[in-house]
């Protein structure tokens, strides 16, 4: 654990329970199914062989599982656990029903709780601020526009018929009038706002710029405002040019 960093507030004991070993924490996490085959791992490498990230990086689900079984806590500070993008191919291919992707999720949260690699959360600050202020996440405008290009009139037709489609599926009409207050109540009760303050403080300590609201206002970047879709989202906020971190 990094000594000068205060642990994240509202650490969920069910998410990362305090145990003697990494393996026990992974197995007892609320994220983990009872059928997890961690102790049955035979290090066959099927997980790494099927992993898309392993083809282009040094990421190895097999090595991560090995470190967890050996209780090697250096894995919490490893860049490797941030290369997974949760496709679950490793879980699908494992002959022992292990789930390296689930283990990685637990390891990431453990690292964050201890103030390790907090910069990986910087990119998500804007999304979190938007959710807290407006009760909704950001709209992936670029993705929608690309779908229009790929699918043409078919996609436009789907958009126009969205409400009839919802009706056919038995879904209620969209009503977001009270969403903001409800979302804020959930965020408040779960300690989200305290976590957000903690993350912002760590980001500022590390000198990471371009992700806090104060970084995006009152600067010369107004002349270079990014268009909708540069980061895959529509936004009316201003950026300093700092690109998103890959997590």
Swiss-Prot record:
Which pathway does it serve?
Cofactor metabolism; coenzyme M-coenzyme B heterodisulfide reduction; coenzyme B and coenzyme M from coenzyme M-coenzyme B heterodisulfide: step 1/1
State the Gene3D superfamilies in the record: Alpha-helical ferredoxin (1.10.1060.10)
Gene Ontology CC annotation, any one: cytoplasm
The positions annotated for binding [4Fe-4S] cluster 2 are 51, 84, 87, 90
Q: Where is the composition biased (Basic and acidic residues)?
A: 216-240
The family database entries (PROSITE patterns) matched by this protein are listed as:
4FE4S_FER_1, 4FE4S_FER_2
InterPro entries reported for this sequence: 4Fe4S_Fe-S-bd, 4Fe4S_Fe_S_CS, HdrC_heterodisulfide_reductase, HdrC_iron-sulfur_subunit, Helical_ferredxn
Q: Which reaction does it catalyse?
A: coenzyme B + coenzyme M + 2 oxidized [2Fe-2S]-[ferredoxin] = coenzyme M-coenzyme B heterodisulfide + 2 reduced [2Fe-2S]-[ferredoxin] + 2 H(+)
Q: What biological-process GO terms show up in the record?
A: methanogenesis
Where is this chain's protein located in or outside the cell? Answer: Cytoplasm
Where on this chain does [4Fe-4S] cluster 1 bind? 41, 44, 47, 94
- Annotated region (Disordered), positions in chain: 216-247
Name of this chain's protein:
Ferredoxin:CoB-CoM heterodisulfide reductase subunit C
What phylogenetic lineage does the species belong to?
Archaea, Methanobacteriati, Methanobacteriota, Stenosarchaea group, Methanomicrobia
């Amino acid at each position: 654990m990094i000594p000068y960093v205060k642990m994240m507030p509202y650490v969920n004991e069910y998410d990362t329970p305090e145990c003697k070993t990494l393996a026990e924490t992974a197995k007892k996490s609320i994220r983990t199914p009872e059928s997890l085959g961690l102790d049955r791992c035979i290090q066959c490498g099927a997980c790494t062989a099927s992993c898309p990230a392993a083809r282009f990086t040094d990421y190895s689900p097999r090595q991560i599982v090995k470190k967890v079984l050996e209780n090697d806590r250096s894995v919490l500070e490893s860049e490797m656990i941030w290369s997974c993008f949760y496709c679950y191919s490793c879980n699908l291919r494992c002959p022992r029903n292990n789930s390296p992707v689930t283990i990685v999720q637990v390891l990431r949260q453990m690292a964050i709780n201890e103030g390790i690699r907090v910069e990986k959360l910087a990119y998500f600050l804007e999304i979190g601020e938007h959710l807290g202020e407006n009760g909704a996440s950001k709209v992936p405008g670029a993705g929608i526009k690309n779908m229009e290009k790929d699918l043409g009139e078919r996609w436009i037709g789907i958009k126009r018929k969205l409400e009839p489609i919802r009706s056919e599926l038995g879904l209620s009409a969209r009503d977001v009038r009270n969403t903001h207050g409800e979302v804020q109540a959930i965020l408040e009760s779960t300690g989200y706002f305290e976590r957000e303050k903690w993350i912002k403080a760590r980001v500022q300590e590390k000198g990471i710029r371009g992700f806090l609201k104060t970084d995006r206002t009152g600067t010369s970047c107004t002349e270079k405002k990014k268009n909708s879709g540069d980061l895959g989202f529509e936004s009316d906020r201003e950026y300093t040019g700092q690109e998103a971190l890959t997590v």
